[in-house]
Amino acid sequence: MNILVVYKKNFEEVHDGGLMSLKGILQRVAAKEHHVDYKPREHVRRADFIARDLVIVFGGDGTLTSLSHNIDPATPVMGVNSHPRTSDPHGSYGFYMDSCIDTFEDDVNTVFAGEAIVNELPRLQALIETTSGNRFTTDPAMNDLLIANTHQYAPSKYHLRRGENQASQQSSGLLFSTWFGQGAWLRNAMSHDEFGALMQRTTTVRTDQHYFVLARDLSPEQRAEAPWAWMDWTDEETTITSDMHRGYVVPDGWDEVHFNRGATITCLLYTSPSPRD
């Protein structure tokens, strides 16, 4: 196997000690049959992920989500929590990090044996088409994706289409979320009752192509006029035509991708594998 280990570098003792343990384990169990490279998160580039059979991410959820933007859908990713809450209440929750130093040796041997469970994790991506006809995509988001006015104090204006439905809206931006990313932002962007009502829709149907969408700070009148355009659980593409002087798409709170008035932005899902023991 051609393996890349990417690690969080913050000079804290718990992370440095864990990294030394991880390296020791890999030297012992992978030295003969596998090639292993190590890179700190700050120095890694997209080219570093090319032709890898496995990417091991050592850190927390934020480390994994930021790196996932550089990883293609066919590359398996293994998350190792460098500071789990089981040993420290101030540690990382590690929703995506199924392994830790205590279990890493058994977990990685399971991967080497081809016996790991592979989860297909959906990721959100936006396709932007400019008024001049140029088309480009944003980095994929594991948790959520925001489409909004670059000036957050100004309203986000756009024409919204999903399936046969259409609506013109003025909101604080559209927040899209994967099923697994609902706890990152979506759940905190609405009231408890609103979130409960939205979750009721997921009980009837749930596929790998479904995602959440919420129009933030939408007026009561607009909510009543087009409930589907306020909050939804859908497997249909959502397309907006911007009526903002300048807007942006932000995947996972990371890089900003800007667009101008008249651009069309389509949000869609695709899946990527993640091995779990």
Describe the function of each predicted region:
Residues 168-219:
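Gly/Ser/Thr-rich active-site loops/lids in small-molecule metabolic enzymes
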Residues 1-58, 70, 90-117, 135-139:
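ATP/NTP phosphate-donor binding region
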Residues 225-261:
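A conserved acidic, glycine/proline-rich C-terminal tail/linker
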